Amino acid sequence: MRTLVFEPFSGASGDMILAGLIDLGADKGEIVEVIQASVDVSVTIEDITKCGIRATDVNIHTKDSARIRSFGELIDIIKDANLPEEVEKNAIAVFRIIGDAEAKVHGMSLEQLHFHEVGQDDALADVIGSCYAIHRMKVENILCTPVNVGGGSVRTAHGTLPVPVPATTEILSGSGLEVHSNGDRELLTPTGAALLTYFANPSDQLPTGKILTTGYGAGDAETDMPNVLRTMLMETTGNLSRDHMEVLETNVDDVTGEVLGNLFETLMKEGAKDVTITPATMKKGRTGHIIHVIAHPENSERIARELIRQTGTLGVRILPTKHRFIAERKMEKVNIIIGKQTFQVTVKIAHDRSDEVLHISAEFEDCRRISQECGLPLKEVIRRAEEKAWNNILKK
């Protein structure tokens, strides 16, 4: 699988991401042409050295560096740029991530918000250029290893703020990206955080595979370690996706079966991906249960709170963060004939990234309704629906 990997060991900003993609092989002539046709800027690209490492440096030269724009104005600029449909969609989505974060931090609606640093022409150029470069690279997967956010404080249009600045923190809170802090200055900007959040899946390490090419995008900071963003194009093994999960666990010994039964539904509504409850013998020979919950990191705290509230447990363990291999899933409808009637059943189709179908399962509620209506055994309705789905796929 053709995979793009970002390694932000020294942070990431919009220009570092753009530079890293160009250094990796994205056509700089095309990118400059697209940027300058979209935004009133000029672009220079050169090779520089950061702590002994050669890297590509991208400089966006603006004519109106103090311009403050609303979210609507930013979107209008992107829509008027005649970009490829995918690039336009992605660029708007990146700015929406930034806008939603800024609006929440400042306690206002997106429509009321006015962008300062991230609304200027250089930020527009970075986002449009990066979205176009990724569009042209035709990768099947994008990964990001843990991000160094930096430390200390930074001077902004809103005054001196701690690093990471509140908008960056808000973007990261729902991203699933792993972060750490090393340094005494801002290394991860809101634009960099939004681009990585939108495009990349988190990974705690490099994937297994062959490194095809490596690039380095230069940042502006002068630090002890090279202030560069490393990019890699890899041929990774396997066609299954990876998902970033956490496992929550707690022991209870004084909770009734009725409460535990209700707990399943409650936790799933709070965002749990799976819940299992295992009988166990606790201290002093008491009968109890171990509750295991699989969840995305952004939902873990809410689920842990609900576990405490529902069961009275005083602590919930979070096991080390895990990755799981997952199949891609899509829902389709098939028609089955029983007697003289035609019934529609939803089926879930699991497939890998190359679209090879791995498994098909009929939706239980549809099959149960049909079984009750026509008197055919449930397992026979399920068999017919899944068989019809397989036949449809084999005909394609």
Swiss-Prot record:
<dbReference type="GO" id="GO:0016829">
    <property type="term" value="F:lyase activity"/>
</dbReference>
<dbReference type="Pfam" id="PF01969">
    <property type="entry name" value="Ni_insertion"/>
</dbReference>
<protein>
    <recommendedName>
        <fullName>Putative nickel insertion protein</fullName>
    </recommendedName>
</protein>
<dbReference type="InterPro" id="IPR002822">
    <property type="entry name" value="Ni_insertion"/>
</dbReference>
<comment type="similarity">
    <text>Belongs to the LarC family.</text>
</comment>
<dbReference type="GO" id="GO:0016151">
    <property type="term" value="F:nickel cation binding"/>
</dbReference>
<keyword id="KW-0533">Nickel</keyword>
